[in-house]
Structure formats: structure tokens, C-alpha cells
From Swiss-Prot:
One of its GO terms (cellular component) is cytoplasm. Its cofactor is Mn(2+); Mg(2+). Keywords: Cytoplasm, Endonuclease, Hydrolase, Manganese, Metal-binding, Nuclease. It is found in: Cytoplasm. It comes from the Archaea. GO terms for biological process: DNA replication, removal of RNA primer; mismatch repair. Its EC number is 3.1.26.4. This is Ribonuclease HII. SUPFAM superfamilies: Ribonuclease H-like. It comes from Aeropyrum pernix (strain ATCC 700893 / DSM 11879 / JCM 9820 / NBRC 100138 / K1). It catalyses: Endonucleolytic cleavage to 5'-phosphomonoester. Manganese or magnesium. Binds 1 divalent metal ion per monomer in the absence of substrate. May bind a second metal ion after substrate binding. It holds the Pfam family RNase_HII. A divalent metal cation binds at D8, E9, D107.
Length: 225
């Protein structure tokens, strides 16, 4: 029986918190069950609906996730980091299930060549690798991965709310998140849960730095060190 794997991510553009990459593996014969459950792109679902589907799809297939931390994103190209995460996820699935998937479907991002090389290193046949834009809305197995990634990211963000008082969705377009970040910087704090290479940090008066030019204003300078 063939295994199909879907891969998607959540939190790429977030200013606060992790980028979560998820892989969902299911037997080909059970793909129809995902459709029957109403699985679709997580962005089209309410938080409550995502959590409910997360529970239901847990009984249909196997999933695993990788979290990419803000300081990792600040230090390396985000697409390369995602490729490494996808490689680890698929490697874990192969190891756990003991078989190579007959098909791996990935929602397209900016390192397609690197992704294909990484998956072929794992023994995945090139013809078994499908990378498409909007795969999360076209393939239920990728939609399932999208739901897992979003639910896990939301849960991790909830932890940051309790630990740091983070407000809002974590995205730079969210006024609540921007106000929280502004307040943090006004207190002279620089928690590691923020992505300091995002231009929003500079706009909000924080210790922004450029990946290309190095630190424009170091954390030590910002904190008075």
C-alpha cells in the first residue's frame, strides 16, 4: 500500500514566534477519508474548526513537525531552513513507517531545487516529488499538513502569551502584536521570540539588524551593554 505525504508550513511571515513545518503521511487508500472529514486549507477554517479537524485527522494518518525558531530565521535564509526542516520531517516519516512514500506533495516556496535535492538524498524518486503553488488548497494531504502546522503554531504562540505576555496573532500586520513589541522595546527588552531581521523591528524602535550587512544596531547597544 502506497504512502502519500503532504508538507506545509505556518508562521513564515510572523514577527513573533516560530515557523512551524508539518508533514502528514497517509495510506493512498485513506485519502478519501480526509476529503470526507472536510479537510481544506487551514486559512479557510476557524481556530475551533482547525482544532477539531486536527483531532479527527490524527486517526487517519501520521504527522510530525519541525519548529524553526526566530533566532534561526535571523541567522540563515528562511527557505534553506524550511528545506532542512522538510528533509528532517520526511526522513522521520520514512524511518517511522519503514517505507518510502509513493508521493510527496509540498506547498511551493522559494527553494524548489534545494528541496528536490534534499528529498532525492533520502531515496525519494524525482517523479514522486510534487511541488505546487496553492497545494494546500488542491491536495487534502497538504491541507492536513497545513492544519497541523497552524494548530501547533497557535499552541506554541499561546505558550509565549503566558511566558512573555505576547498579544495578537504574532504577525506584523496585527496592531495588537505591534503594540506589544513597541512596549517591549520601550522597556529596553529584547526577547528571543522576536525576529530582529524583520523591518518592522526598525520601525518600532527595536534592535533591528540586516542579514546582509550584519548588525546595524546590536542587542548589546540596545540594552546598554
Amino acid at each position: 500500500m502506497g504512502i502519500v505525504v503532504g508538507v506545509d508550513e505556518a508562521g513564515r511571515g510572523s514577527l513573533v514566534g516560530d515557523l512551524v513545518v508539518a508533514g502528514f503521511a497517509v495510506e493512498e487508500a485513506r485519502l478519501g477519508e480526509l476529503q470526507s472529514l472536510g479537510v481544506r486549507d487551514s486559512k479557510q477554517l476557524s481556530p475551533a474548526a482547525r482544532v477539531e479537524l486536527y483531532r479527527e485527522i490524527s486517526g487517519v494518518g501520521f504527522f510530525t513537525v519541525e519548529a524553526i525558531r526566530p533566532w534561526e530565521i535571523d541567522g540563515e535564509n528562511i527557505n534553506i531552513l524550511v528545506t532542512k526542516a522538510v528533509e528532517e520531517i520526511v526522513s522521520r516519516i520514512v524511518s517511522y513507517l519503514g517505507v518510502h512514500p509513493s508521493l510527496v506533495v509540498v506547498d511551493k516556496y522559494g527553494d524548489v531545487q534545494g528541496l528536490r535535492l534534499a528529498l532525492t538524498r533520502l531515496g525519494i524518486e524525482p517523479r514522486s516529488i510534487l511541488v505546487e503553488e496553492k497545494a494546500d488548497s488542491r491536495y487534502p494531504v497538504v491541507s492536513a499538513a497545513s492544519i497541523v502546522a497552524k494548530v501547533v503554531r497557535d499552541a506554541r504562540l499561546q505558550v509565549l502569551r503566558r511566558m512573555y505576555g505576547v498579544r495578537g496573532s504574532g504577525y506584523p500586520s496585527d496592531p495588537e502584536t505591534r503594540e506589544w513589541v513597541r512596549e517591549v522595546f520601550a522597556r529596553g527588552e529584547a526577547p528571543r521570540v522576536i525576529r530582529y531581521t524583520w523591518s518592522t523591528v526598525r520601525k518600532l524602535g527595536g534592535p533591528w539588524r540586516s542579514k546582509k550587512a550584519g548588525r546595524n544596531r546590536s542587542l548589546d547597544e540596545f540594552l546598554g551593554g
